[in-house]
Amino acid sequence: MTTFRFCRDCNNMLYPREDKENNRLLFECRTCSYIEEAGSPLVYRHELITNIGETAGVVQDIGSDPTLPRSDRECPKCHSRENVFFQSQQRRKDTSMVLFFVCLACSHIFTSDQKNKRTQFS
């Protein structure tokens, strides 16, 4: 969240300025030349949050993709041991690496932990 700083002498807005001699960030009033040191060298931070699904890009013929690794993990739905797997497409700090398996027999999507089962896609 962006915060504005104001001059303690004239109440006008303070603007960021670089102190090139000491290599530090300052805030300066353009009206009365009041200067104060910034607590942090960060002026602005823009965090991008994407909202793509965990299984984005899964299509019906995913099993014919030769670039995907194969696994013999048992499908919890049909008990087949032929599947492909891929990593979750969510790239956020708060998510851990999740592997998704797609059964080649029934197209069921599941993860390595059996609690997080996925349904069949069309």
Curated annotation (Swiss-Prot):
The keyword Transcription applies. InterPro entries: DNA-dir_RNA_pol-M_15_CS, Rpa12/Rpb9/Rpc10/TFS, Zn_ribbon_RPB9, Zn_ribbon_RPB9_C, Znf_TFIIS. It holds the Pfam family Zn_ribbon_RPB9. The keyword Metal-binding applies. Transmembrane segments: none annotated. GO terms for molecular function: DNA-directed RNA polymerase activity; nucleic acid binding; RNA-directed RNA polymerase activity; zinc ion binding. This is DNA-directed RNA polymerase II subunit RPB9. It comes from Candida glabrata (strain ATCC 2001 / BCRC 20586 / JCM 3761 / NBRC 0622 / NRRL Y-65 / CBS 138). The gene is RPB9.
